[in-house]
Swiss-Prot record:
It comes from Escherichia coli (strain K12). This is Phosphoribosylaminoimidazole-succinocarboxamide synthase. Converts 4-carboxy-5-aminoimidazole ribonucleotide (CAIR) to 4-(N-succinylcarboxamide)-5-aminoimidazole ribonucleotide (SAICAR). Keywords: ATP-binding, Ligase, Nucleotide-binding, Purine biosynthesis. Signal peptide: none annotated. One of its GO terms (molecular function) is ATP binding. Its EC number is 6.3.2.6.
Length: 237
């Protein structure tokens, strides 16, 4: 399957059309951003690591009965995916307090959240992805009530699967975001799952093993990503 025209260039991925109108090529670049794209740097191997990491996670979720857009890997940095009509709202699950939640509520980082919190954010970099709720989604027509309920159900199901997967690898799944779209009327998981869009801490040391290493200038970003991948059993080379 050959990529054709560039359709969209995001902060870390590029989307291309193919000869099949139902399929796209997703290319993972070495770019890393923070502050809604205000700060961007390149890291060798990052595109490859995230592409293979994402394929591994999507495969595990598909095995658990969660529909995903993933078709197959095409190269070290590219995969073939179904073309989705993306919902402009992302789902976030929080198992522990971190990031914007800590700032917003003034609570201690790392406290366990039981049951996990479920948040919705409008995907809009210019507005810094404002937090919204189910009522906004219905009023503005971003997603139907039925499809939003399905997105929430699949997000919690993914959390159950991934918490155990990471726990078995000696990692805490602190929080993560998921994006969904519609494929022939069905709610399907799209975009990616990688350390770019999740928070992962070492169970013993609480060392941060995700993009917070870049956001907080901790260093060792790719080393952390590769360490997480190795613990999970992702084949990188």
């Amino acid at each position: 399957m050959q990529k054709q025209a560039e359709l969209y260039r995001g902060k870390a991925k590029t989307v291309y059309s193919t000869e099949n109108p139902d399929l796209l090529v997703l290319e993972f670049r070495n770019d890393t951003s923070a502050g809604d794209g205000a700060r961007i740097e390149q890291f060798d191997r990052k595109g490859m690591v995230n592409n293979k990491f994402n394929y591994f996670i999507m495969s595990k979720l598909a095995e658990a009965g969660i529909p995903t857009q993933m078709e197959r890997l095409l190269s070290d940095t590219e995969c073939l995916v179904k073309k989705l009509d993306m919902v402009p709202v992302e789902c976030v699950v929080r198992n522990r307090a971190a990031g914007s939640l800590v700032k917003r509520l003034g609570i201690e980082e790392g406290i366990e959240l039981n049951p996990p919190l479920f948040d919705l954010f409008l995907k809009n970099d210019a507005m810094h992805d404002p937090m919204v709720n189910e009522s906004y989604c219905e009023t503005f027509g971003w997603v139907s009530k039925e499809n939003l309920a399905r997105m929430k159900e699949l997000t919690y199901k993914a959390n159950d699967v991934l918490k155990k997967l990471f726990d078995d690898a000696g990692l805490i799944l602190v929080d993560f975001k998921l994006e969904f779209g519609l494929y022939k009327g069905e709610v399907v998981l799209g975009d990616e799952f990688s350390p770019d869009g999740s928070r992962l801490w070492d169970k013993e040391t609480l060392e941060k093993m995700d993009k917070d290493r870049f956001r907080q200038s901790l260093g060792g970003l790719i080393e952390a990503y590769e360490a997480v991948a190795r613990r999970l059993g992702v084949q990188l080379d």
